UniProtKB/Swiss-Prot annotation:
PANTHER family hit by this protein: C-1-TETRAHYDROFOLATE SYNTHASE, CYTOPLASMIC (PTHR48099:SF5), C-1-TETRAHYDROFOLATE SYNTHASE, CYTOPLASMIC-RELATED (PTHR48099)
HAMAP family per the UniProt record, alphabetical: THF_DHG_CYH
EC number from the UniProt entry: 1.5.1.5, 3.5.4.9
Stated name of the protein: Bifunctional protein FolD
Keyword Membrane attached: no
Pathway: One-carbon metabolism; tetrahydrofolate interconversion
Quaternary organization: Homodimer.
GO cellular component, one term: cytosol
Length: 290
């Protein structure tokens, strides 16, 4: 029986609508609307598309969106100064610097310059550490979005055998922590892992994030497994495809995400949720200081 499709586009639309309702309620109570600053360095075509989608989603949800499009040759110091000003800006609750950055700018330095309470990407070491320690904090958008998708399947995650393919700081590592926190038994596969196919076959849940189109073949997927394809790759033909052979895998999986229309929309929806959470957290900090 073909897998059920985890429609991230539809679920994300509902999540964005809920954020919009919450923003409207804030304004009715006399609170300011949440504010997000998005910084784009250079004009990487893919990054520019992602940034446009994020800004549009903010506007639709009633979130204040400020755009900072910087030249590709901007110095690291100038970028850090911009972040410092946004850290101090009372109208801004979230700061997002679109990655990747040009080679002359150190990404980790930039990430660590963002105030952790405004780090809506969830990449700051403080927020990563809080995730590892199972403490409240701003969580990386894509893994948090994946957990929302999994919740919509109604499947009990506790005790499941999960395989995460990829160990990036953006997806693989925080995804592993999210699944550990859900009490899964997690195996991480990377470029030095042996017998990857066999490890995947044994999994109840597979999360693929390696950036290699079709790497995970259909016969790697165990019968009834849940497959989350985070990969998004553009082929020479212009077609977008994931890391999983969708057609073959969908004949074995119980649930599977499409590419596009699976995880991508959830990442954007989660960014809005994080921005709303950041605004609420700052409200609490302000009230506590009074």
């Amino acid at each position: 029986m073909p897998a059920q499709i985890l429609d991230g586009k539809a679920i994300a639309a509902k999540r964005r609508a809920l954020v919009g309702e919450a923003v409207g309620q804030r304004i009715e109570r006399g609170l300011r609307r949440p504010g997000l600053a998005v910084i784009l360095v250079g004009q990487n075509p893919a990054s520019a598309v992602y940034v446009r989608n994020k800004r549009r989603a903010c506007e639709e949800a009633g979130i204040l969106s400020r755009a900072y499009d910087l030249d590709a040759d901007v110095s690291e110091g100038e970028l850090l100064e911009r972040i410092d000003r946004l850290n101090a800006d009372p109208e801004i609750d979230g700061i997002l610097v679109q990655l990747p950055l040009p080679g002359h700018i150190d990404e980790q330095t930039v990430i660590e310059r963002i105030d952790p309470v405004k780090d809506v990407d969830g990449f700051h070491p403080e927020n990563m550490g809080r995730l590892a320690l199972r403490l409240p904090g701003l969580r990386p958008c894509t893994p948090r979005g994946v957990m929302t998708l999994l919740h919509h399947t109604g499947i009990e995650l506790e005790g499941r055998d999960a395989v995460v393919l990829g160990q990036s700081n953006i997806v693989g590592r925080p995804m592993t922590l999210e699944l550990l926190n859900a009490r899964c038994t997690v195996t991480v596969c990377h470029s030095r892992t042996r017998n990857v196919a066999e490890r995947v076959r044994q999994a109840d849940l597979v999360v693929a994030s390696v950036g290699k189109p079709g790497l995970i073949q259909g016969d790697w997927i165990g019968e009834g497994a849940v497959v989350i394809d985070v990969g998004i790759n553009r082929l020479d033909s212009g077609k977008l495809t994931g890391d999983v052979d969708f057609e073959a895998a969908s004949q074995r999986a119980s649930w599977i995400t499409p590419v596009p229309g699976g995880v991508g929309p959830m990442t954007v929806a989660t960014l809005l949720e994080n921005t709303l959470d950041a605004a609420r957290n700052r409200d609490e900090l302000t009230a506590a200081a009074c």
